[in-house]
UniProtKB/Swiss-Prot annotation:
GO terms for molecular function: DNA-binding transcription factor activity; transcription cis-regulatory region binding. GO terms for cellular component: cytoplasm; nucleoid. Belongs to the MraZ family. Gene3D superfamilies: Transcriptional regulator MraZ domain. It comes from Clostridium beijerinckii (strain ATCC 51743 / NCIMB 8052). Its main location: cytoplasm. Residues 5-47, 76-119 form the SpoVT-AbrB domain. Keywords: Cytoplasm, DNA-binding, Repeat, Transcription, Transcription regulation. This is Transcriptional regulator MraZ. One of its GO terms (biological process) is negative regulation of DNA-templated transcription initiation. HAMAP family: MraZ. It is found in: Cytoplasm, Nucleoid. InterPro entries: MraZ, MraZ_C, MraZ_dom, MraZ_N, MraZ_sf, SpoVT-AbrB_dom, SpoVT-AbrB_sf.
Length: 142
């Protein structure tokens, strides 16, 4: 399980330096893809396989399902870290997430979300009504 928030930056060669606490769970090789809300999602390989299996069951006849699978898999790639915990994020994914230098990585249960520092700040400063969200979670039994 991934938890916590970590602020860091791309190195001079535009590589992400994965914080040690997140690296332990992700492993030296993981999958990164376009996430929702303008961030990137990083999954350990075993979690990625579970997600693949679930998405394979979506009906091809459903347009929204096809669109989501295309969105999710078209940006996906494996990232392999070097001994210092650095890995290269493809340019198309950096552009999608608006990542230029400063990064915030957050642990979210089975995945790591990678945000540009600016987008993460905007997200947290937006008018999200957490009380309303909490009420909806109650409706889901949480």
């Amino acid at each position: 399980m991934f938890i916590g928030e970590y602020q860091h930056a791309l190195d001079p060669k535009n590589r992400i330096i994965v914080p040690a606490k997140l690296r332990d769970g992700l492993g030296n090789k993981f999958v990164i893809t376009k996430g929702l809300d303008g961030c990137l999602y990083a999954y350990p390989l075993d979690e990625w396989r579970i997600l693949e299996d679930k998405l394979k069951t979506l009906p091809l006849t459903n347009k929204d399902a096809r669109s989501f699978v295309r969105f999710f898999f078209s940006g996906a790639c494996e990232v392999e870290l070097d001994k210092q915990g650095r890995g290269l994020i493809p340019q198309n994914l950096k552009e999608y997430a608006g990542i230029e230098k400063d990064i915030v990585s957050i642990g979210v249960l089975s995945r790591v979300e990678i945000w540009s520092k600016e987008k993460w700040s905007e997200y947290n400063e937006s008018n999200i009504d957490f009380d309303s969200i909490a009420e909806k979670m109650n409706d889901l039994g949480i």
